[in-house]
Amino acid sequence: MSHRDTLFSAPIARLGDWTFDERVAEVFPDMIQRSVPGYSNIISMISMLAERFVQPGTQVYDLGCSLGAATLSVRRNIHHDNCKIIAIDNSPAMIERCRRHIDAYKAPTPVDVIEGDIRDIAIENASMVVLNFTLQFLEPSERQALLDKIYQGLNPGGALVLSEKFSFEDAKVGELLFNMHHDFKRANGYSELEISQKRSMLENVMLTDSVETHKARLHKAGFEHSELWFQCFNFGSLVALKAEDAA
């Protein structure tokens, strides 16, 4: 059962950096629905991408799986034999709940739920990789290496789904979408105090990039094609494709 997010409804004397701890994990479904515009659309459409890209006898990786929403979405639309999903997160609280969620929905495709660092996981025989609001929590200097590893581990014709909060090179557009995102949170019942305190905790650990920066990294990693397939305000998702004739 999901609980309502009231973590920041009262003043907090000392705001530390954001962590995905037990308190966050408990309210995460409510928090992300009320904080990330378009989240449900991205999750549901990831299953459509899975239907197009997952191949028999291959693996799917959900890197930074949190409670397993993307994993479950992918698994619903795998209709091939001998596939496996590998879901990884470094938060013990998230992984504990993720295992429960995965176990609650029976399906023929097995899921390995792993507590670990996505930077240390080998990517092998992958037809699809999902980074759903995960890359933004890595140090910027570590992002290219992860994308390089994903590209190398993808089979020819494979796809990476990369969902992120974006910054914008056009400051005027960035300000507009930033303010619209805050309007979205207010409309979903968050107070000014809640919005401010959460932002203060996130500002040192969630460092956003522009769509142009993401595309440049993907190209450098080797992806021949990448494009934004979904956006709502300053949140969105790109799909990057490895060529079918790639070595």
Curated annotation (Swiss-Prot):
SUPFAM superfamilies per the UniProt record, alphabetical: S-adenosyl-L-methionine-dependent methyltransferases
GO molecular function, one term: carboxyl- or carbamoyltransferase activity
Biological processes per GO annotation: tRNA wobble uridine modification
Catalytic activity as recorded in UniProt: prephenate + S-adenosyl-L-methionine = carboxy-S-adenosyl-L-methionine + 3-phenylpyruvate + H2O
Keywords for the protein's UniProt record, in alphabetical order: S-adenosyl-L-methionine, Transferase
Keyword Mitochondrion recorded: no
UniProt-listed InterPro entries: CmoA, Methyltransf_25, SAM-dependent_MTases_sf
Subunit structure: Homodimer.
Function: Catalyzes the conversion of S-adenosyl-L-methionine (SAM) to carboxy-S-adenosyl-L-methionine (Cx-SAM).
Name by which UniProt lists this protein: Carboxy-S-adenosyl-L-methionine synthase
Source organism of this protein record: Shigella boydii serotype 4 (strain Sb227)
Originating gene: cmoA
